């Protein structure tokens, strides 16, 4: 019969095996020996459940099913980093540092792991709690799921009570295996390892998290000063002595030239790593100098993240397809041999227009270089002409629309070819998708696949038909059950009460965006007033130029538009502006009157569009760039160059919470 001493001995042995294998990558035993000792441990725990502690290696395999994720407050905020995109940005950062603390400085440079920021709390050396970064102040409790990561020790080498920060991630090989399994099971594939890691750590079933083979690198303590060290580099060394996994590829740099060399080295070597990185993090090494530099609302002034330029990858151009947009513009799209770019698999990319294809001499069958603009949108950069075999085919735009066969035209001062047939089915379908979108009529449950079904089965021919759909007809569609149909019909009904600007934007009048639609709705109050307005009246309104005014007059001169509006009226769709009018609001309510506000980074409680609409409703103007005329910058998480410029110009910087304090208390935002 086993005694407790043997049980505790097994825990220590298995912990050491895990440290050797997962942390320092130096396995000291065969898998069979590890498994044999784990089975011995499990048998003892089955016989003596009262001995089991949260630090037991058996807890790493998962099994606990969680009810949800509690909120966790970070005692020390988990700040995000400002971004640098070139040497000029880094030189500006370096200048600000030197202006404040002098020239006796060094930077600790570390790989920027592309994963999920987390915090680990240890109490008397034992793992107590793990949490996500969240908004930097409040995160989610993912203690059980982080426990399944084998490289996170359940006990430190010393009995410290500390909060450690790091990046949880999914290695490339684990990501590939996971997607292979999901493909075999007919499940949706993860776009990239970062999304897979984040999704794994938010699983309520910890067994799923345990099966995902996640890893972690630790890079900071909430307050390194508490550990008796004077530099960040010494702090990282101490983390290693505690048994925590720290990335080995860090380097202490004594000049910007050394920083540039480190960046250049890892720009070239990043593809060979077993995990994704998306940049390099610079940290002022001296902790006292860090304290002198201080922090902004969202980021430390003593650290910055250099983001790698967009990755360029070669692949084969298999074909060029033509897509018809809602305004009739014909856009050529490259069909590519699937290739991995910046963390996702790319098989299609925009070619923009015929002139660009001709200018770049892009041919079907070419080997082409592609990248993601802003690491998001795939685009073809150029053909690699030296790889041509002679079988490649030059591309020529057709003379007729691929959807309705109408003759294509090129309007004055436009490079794009356009189908001007108002009954073109492709334009109508794209227009319907736009009409139901969030910024327009915001009809939930009416995605592209449902619209395509409705259109192909002749249940709708224009946007007005949406409001006359019956439950019986909707139930006949694929993947539309009783609950889905009920929710969809309720959403359609609710959309009838939208204020006029939502309808105006949804109608897709050429050149009229969401902001102009709001200005028109406020000025004219009703659709009837707007549709008889002349060009002179329209151009007298802020945000409405001559080109837009011409487009509006032309739109409402169309008899088919009059018929459409009558159908929408018959369906009960509101055609009046129901929002607040500036002239009816007091000075106290117009808290942003005459103010220019810039939004940057990710907001947690508000969408970017909601924040913009609320600021504008209170008299403010939302701009896309920071200048001396900017009054306030609202910075969410991962704010970049706009935040840095605001700091440079000494413009007031608000957090999202600061913004919410100035907004009317709608929807519990101020709770």
Curated annotation (Swiss-Prot):
InterPro entries reported for this sequence: BRCT_dom, BRCT_dom_sf, DisA/LigA_HHH, DNA_ligase, DNA_ligase_CS, DNAligase_adenylation, DNAligase_N, Hlx-hairpin-Hlx_DNA-bd_motif
Xref: CDD domains: BRCT_DNA_ligase_like, LIGANc
Active site (UniProt): 112
Enzyme class: ligase
Record bears the keyword NAD: yes
Alphabetical GO biological process terms: DNA repair; DNA replication
Signal peptide: none
Molecular function terms, GO-annotated: DNA binding; DNA ligase (NAD+) activity; metal ion binding
Binding site for Zn(2+): 401, 404, 419, 424
Cofactor(s) this protein cannot do without: Mg(2+); Mn(2+)
EC code: 6.5.1.2
GO cellular component: cytosol
Swiss-Prot/TrEMBL keywords: DNA damage, DNA repair, DNA replication, Ligase, Magnesium, Manganese, Metal-binding, NAD, Zinc
NCBIfam families for this protein: dnlj, PRK07956.1
Family assignment from sequence similarity: Belongs to the NAD-dependent DNA ligase family. LigA subfamily.
Its job: DNA ligase that catalyzes the formation of phosphodiester linkages between 5'-phosphoryl and 3'-hydroxyl groups in double-stranded DNA using NAD as a coenzyme and as the energy source for the reaction. It is essential for DNA replication and repair of damaged DNA.
Protein name stated in the entry: DNA ligase
Organism, as annotated: Listeria monocytogenes serotype 4b (strain CLIP80459)
């Amino acid at each position: 019969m086993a005694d407790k001493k043997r049980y505790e001995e097994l825990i220590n042995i298995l912990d050491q095996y895990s440290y050797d294998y997962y942390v320092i990558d130096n396995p000291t035993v065969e898998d069979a020996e590890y498994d044999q000792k784990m089975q011995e441990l499990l048998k003892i725990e089955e016989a003596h459940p009262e001995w089991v502690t949260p630090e037991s290696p058996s807890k790493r395999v998962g099994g606990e099913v969680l009810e949800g994720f509690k909120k966790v407050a970070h005692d020390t905020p988990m700040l995000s980093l400002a971004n640098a995109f070139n040497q000029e940005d880094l030189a500006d950062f370096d200048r600000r540092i030197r202006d404040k603390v002098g020239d006796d400085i060094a930077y600790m440079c570390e790989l920027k792991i592309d994963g999920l920021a987390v915090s680990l709390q240890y109490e008397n050396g034992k793992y107590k709690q793990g949490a996500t970064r969240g908004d930097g102040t409040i995160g989610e409790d993912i203690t059980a799921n982080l426990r399944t990561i084998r490289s996170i020790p359940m006990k430190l080498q010393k009995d410290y009570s500390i909060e450690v920060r790091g990046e949880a991630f999914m290695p490339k090989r684990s990501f590939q295996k996971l997607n292979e399994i999901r493909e075999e099971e007919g499940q949706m594939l993860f776009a990239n390892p970062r999304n897979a890691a984040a999704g794994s750590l938010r699983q309520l079933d910890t067994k799923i998290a345990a099966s995902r083979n996640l890893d972690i690198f630790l890079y900071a303590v909430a307050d390194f000063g508490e550990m008796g060290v004077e530099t960040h580099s010494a702090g990282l060394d101490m983390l290693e002595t505690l048994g925590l996994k720290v990335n080995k590829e860090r380097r202490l740099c004594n000049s910007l030239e050394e920083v540039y060399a480190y960046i250049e080295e890892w720009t070239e070597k990043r593809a060979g790593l077993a995990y994704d990185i998306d940049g390099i993090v610079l940290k002022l090494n001296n902790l006292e100098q860090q304290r002198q530099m201080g922090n902004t609302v969202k980021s430390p002034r003593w650290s910055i993240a250099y983001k790698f330029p967009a990755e360029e990858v070669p692949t084969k151009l298999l074909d060029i397809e033509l897509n018809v947009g809602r305004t009739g513009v014909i856009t050529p799209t490259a069909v590519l041999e699937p290739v991995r770019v910046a963390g996702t698999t790319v098989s299609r990319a925009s070619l923009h227009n015929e002139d660009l294809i001709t200018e770049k001499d892009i041919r079907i069958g070419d080997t082409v270089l592609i990248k993601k603009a802003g690491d998001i949108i795939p685009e073809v950069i150029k053909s690699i002409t030296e790889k041509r075999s002679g079988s490649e085919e030059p591309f020529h735009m057709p003379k007729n629309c691929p959807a309705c066969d109408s003759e294509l035209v090129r309007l004055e001062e436009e490079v794009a070819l356009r189908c001007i047939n108002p009954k073109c089915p492709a334009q109508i379908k794209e227009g319907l998708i736009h009409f139901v979108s969030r910024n327009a009529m915001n009809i939930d449950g009416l995605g592209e696949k449902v619209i395509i079904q409705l259109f192909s089965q002749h249940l709708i021919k224009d946007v007005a038909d949406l409001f006359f759909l019956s439950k019986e007809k909707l139930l006949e569609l694929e993947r539309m059950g009783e609950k889905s149909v009920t929710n969809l019909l309720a959403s359609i009904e609710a959309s009838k009460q939208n204020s006029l600007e939502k309808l105006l934007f949804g109608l897709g009048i050429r050149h009229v965006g969401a902001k102009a639609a709001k200005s028109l709705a406020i000025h004219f109050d009703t659709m009837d007033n707007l549709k008889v307005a002349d060009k002179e009246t329209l151009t007298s309104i802020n945000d409405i130029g001559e080109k837009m005014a011409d487009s509006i007059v032309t739109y409402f001169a169309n008899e088919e538009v009059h018929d459409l509006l009558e159908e929408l009226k018959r369906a009960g769709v509101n055609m009046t502006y129901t929002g607040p009018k500036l002239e009816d609001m007091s000075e106290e309510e117009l808290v942003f009157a005459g103010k220019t506000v810039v939004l940057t980074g990710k907001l947690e409680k508000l969408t970017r569009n909601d924040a913009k609409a609320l600021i504008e409703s209170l008299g403010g103007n939302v701009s896309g760039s920071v200048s001396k005329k900017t009054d306030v910058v609202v910075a969410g998480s991962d704010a970049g160059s706009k935040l840095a410029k605001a700091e440079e110009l000494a413009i007031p910087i608000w957090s999202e919470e600061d913004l919410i304090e100035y907004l009317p208390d709608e929807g519990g935002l101020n709770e």
